[in-house]
Design a protein with these regions (language model features):
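Compact, glycine-rich, soluble single-domain proteins
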Residues: 1-117
């Protein structure tokens, strides 16, 4: 699925099921500059991520129900520190130093049935 956030466009995998969310990007050795994973939740809630089995340094972008960025936290490879935020409906994982900032907005393109988030 293609998304835009800030001034960048990404091709993302969408994680909707609990199994997809738990797996995340754990098995990836690298991530393309314009690649990422978008986690979609049913309603705004407190969300915690960690990097325990993830080899790639990531920006973890927490967004509210309107797709507005609440915060961007840096995840370090294999770190077990919890990175938490409340009021979250979407989380985007992309390479670190993405330039995404609080207040940026998520735009999802309608190119397939993934647009029905």
């Amino acid at each position: 699925m293609k998304i835009e956030i800030g001034d960048k466009e990404y091709n993302v995998e969408v994680a909707r099921t609990e199994e997809e969310k738990v797996k995340g990007l754990q098995e990836k050795e690298s991530l393309g500059e314009d690649e990422g994973m978008l986690f979609v939740y049913d309603e705004p809630q407190e969300i915690a991520f960690w990097m325990k089995d993830t080899a790639i340094p990531l920006d973890i972008v927490f967004m509210d129900e309107d797709g507005e960025v609440i915060s961007v936290k840096q995840g370090q490879p294999y770190d077990e520190t919890l990175l938490e935020e409340d009021g979250v409906m979407y989380v985007l994982e992309v390479n670190q130093n993405s330039g995404i900032q609080p207040g940026d907005e998520l735009d999802m393109e309608d190119d397939d049935d993934d647009s029905q988030l």
